[in-house]
């Protein structure tokens, strides 16, 4: 008797990214819940009166069929199709499961910059991006960094000319207005395994100065020697003349050009006899400051008394 051999038809299953399933809560355990629906049907292709046997990579028996959801790491299993006869003639094939690493990304916090550079009213500032990739790929809890041998990084951003750019690094320094840069990390073996992260670059304006010089003229208060040229001034009353946003800004007053001698109580300031000068520094809520009306200008902020 010559018995016809069964046929173990070739079966395949798509490689998967770790964690890329609602059933997979751990994207770093290298195990994926594969949906094996259809494997048995493809394997037999209509054959009957046969029994199938599935063995893992260590030749441990899994079952006569695979579970509908088969949780496994990367491995190649062996499948035997055997006739239900006394001769038990059989044929074999293999099925490869591949679980690819999914990248992880971590928060990259870029400190806010004040408008600066060639112009300090154009909304641009230069940012140091030398450590962006390192921070993006490094787990802050374990200090473990994903290797660029395994993963690629790309950035989508708008350059100084308004062009949308895709590049594997950010310019350094990165001269930009406020924008969200999208970083994408991808497994080099499987481009489906990728993740994105927004990196926020924020440029905030400096104080907008209306006038850099305010003159205060006031009658002698008559205290002390008559007409001694000394009187008390509330310097804070002129803040609105310097800036429209004065209520949201911090004003500091100094008696010297180098801003080393601070006036502790500007609401009760006695001037030097007959003529005095007070120098100012104005700071926004974001910490951006001006001491002159224009960038590095000689038009210093000053009160003349």
Identify what each model region corresponds to.
Residues 1-305:
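Extracellular low-complexity Ser/Thr/Asn/Gly-rich intrinsically disordered segments
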